[in-house]
Structure formats: structure tokens, C-alpha cells
Amino acid sequence: MWGTPQGGNLSPLLANIMLNELDKEMEKRGLNFVRYADDCIIMVGSEMSANRVMRNISRFIEEKLGLKVNMTKSKVDKPQGLKYLGFGFYFDSRAYQFKAKPHAKSVAKFKKRMKELTCRSWGVSNSCKVEKLNQLIRGWINYFKIGSMKRLCKELDSRIRYRLRMCIWKQWKTPQNRIKNLMKLGVDKDTAWITAYTGSRIAYVCQRRVMNFAINKERLTKFGLVSMLDYYTERCVTC
């Protein structure tokens, strides 16, 4: 058997040792590049240049370093079509430059995990769900903080609060308990009664304005929930 196990701790170290000569070669040629272990992007000004550089660098890797280039994963593409280390790229017309952001696949993966952590049938307390959500949020933001994602954080915040409202509404269980808790949160008795006895599905009830008022951002923050937007704004590298 040849090579090292994929995903092992040793693989990135060995890749850096082997590809150090590649870094020197690309620097000597004056190329703009980013490399993490064996994952590399080379940036040039035109498609013609990109095809030429890809041929030459692939030849250098195979002939000088004795490594095999995986051509199924190697391609020439515009920045908008790239996914690199979980990031995607877009052109900011106001700044007139390309910027990084979480790739759509990374966002979808986050949403899937967030949905799992806010599943109403998961038999743990809501405080436990918030704790797990906070771990997810902090880890995700700390990784992607170099990207531009204020609007995305705002959208995800709204989605998280909505799903937590559904968890809380289910926890209240009976109409009497729901009326009592809504009134504690400042909802008048008539509105609380109508909301509690609406008979609608939880997903619909928790979209209503009364629920947005009763279980708002401030109250969920007091409950311990970390705001993605606030956490990102405090740590944003490009803001």
C-alpha cells in the first residue's frame, strides 16, 4: 500500500514538505497563488494564461516532484465557479474586487446541522439545544470570519430564532400553559387566548407577529443564544 491515509494528521505535513518546491517554483515564475496542503489555487489574468500555467505546473509536479496530478479535480474556472476550503467568491462592484464568502454547499451543511439541533422531537432541554447551537455558531463564524456574510448571518439568525420558537411552543404543550407564558412575556390576554387555541400547526403559529414579539431576539439572548450577526461583526476581518 502506498501513501498515507486520507484525512490523517500526517497527510498535510507531508504535503507541505513535498510541495515546498512547488511553492518556490511558482514564486520564481511570479504567480499569485494560495495553497493549503495539496489544495491550491493559482490566479492569472486570462483563460489563455490559465490553461498555459495549468499545463506547465502539472508537468512540473509530475516530472520534477514525481507526483500524480488528479485532473478530474483540476480545472480552469472563473472565481465565481470556485469552491476552496469551504469558501466561494463573488465580485463586489463597489469595491471593484473579488471577495470571499461561505460557499453555498457550506451554508447548506450549516443549515442541515442547525435543523438537527433544533429538531422538536429531540428529547433534550431547550437550554441544551441553545448550548449546542452556540458551539456550532461560534465554530462556523470563527472559520468563515474572513468572508463577507453580514446578510447571510442576519438570515440565519432569523431562521434559528424561528426554529427555537417552535421548540419553546411545543414545550409549553397545553393551551393553558401557552396562555400563561405568553402573558408573562407581555402579550395581552385576548391575543394570548386566540394564539393558544388557534389550532394551527406549530410552524404557522411561530411565524405570527405575536410570537416574534413574545420570543424576540433580546429574550433569546437572555436565554443564552449567541447572535450570529453580533458574533460575526465583533470578529469580522474585512468589515
Predicted segments with their positions:
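Non-catalytic terminal/accessory segments
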Residues: 1-239
